[in-house]
UniProtKB/Swiss-Prot annotation:
Keywords: Coiled coil, Isopeptide bond, Lipoprotein, Membrane, Palmitate, Transmembrane, Transmembrane helix, Ubl conjugation. Residues 1-30 are annotated as: Disordered. It is a single-pass type IV membrane protein. Pfam families: Synaptobrevin. InterPro entries: Synaptobrevin-like, Synaptobrevin/VAMP, V_SNARE_CC. This is Synaptobrevin homolog 1. The keyword DNA repair does not apply. SNC1 and SNC2 are vesicle-targeting proteins essential for normal secretory traffic between the Golgi and the plasma membrane. They may also be involved in vesicle fusion. It is found in: Endomembrane system. A lipid is attached at residue 95 (S-palmitoyl cysteine). Residues 112-117 are vesicular. It comes from the Eukaryota.
Length: 117
């Protein structure tokens, strides 16, 4: 090899051409190294994905907690509204009953007085 060309561990040297078994060994080593590099890359991607998943799960958990708190507040508010509507309905029924009683008294009392003479 001349000093002007950079060193390449996968390039064949003059001595390697004379030994084909050494070439096979180096190509097999290069294949294994490429496979290892691919596996390392995949594992790094998997680790990053797991970390992102953990962050998303934490975010979802926080949102679920907030939703549970909001649901409890909504339930309390709904119960207050239900009780207020029940009370209004009761007052309306009592007023209606009172009006009916007054109308009956206004109608029945003059008739009773008229027939009692």
């Amino acid at each position: 090899m001349s000093s002007s060309t950079p060193f390449d561990p996968y390039a064949l040297s003059e001595h390697d051409e004379e030994r084909p078994q050494n070439v096979q060994s180096k190509s097999r080593t290069a294949e294994l190294q490429a496979e290892i590099d691919d596996t390392v890359g995949i594992m790094r991607d998997n680790i990053n994905k797991v970390a992102e998943r953990g962050e998303r799960l934490t975010s979802i958990e926080d949102k679920a907690d907030n939703l549970a708190v909001s649901a409890q507040g909504f339930k309390r508010g709904a119960n207050r509204v239900r009780k207020a509507m029940w009370y209004k309905d009761l007052k309306m029924k009592m007023c209606l009953a009172l009006v009916i009683i007054i109308l009956l008294v206004v109608i029945i009392v003059p008739i009773a007085v008229h027939f009692s003479r």
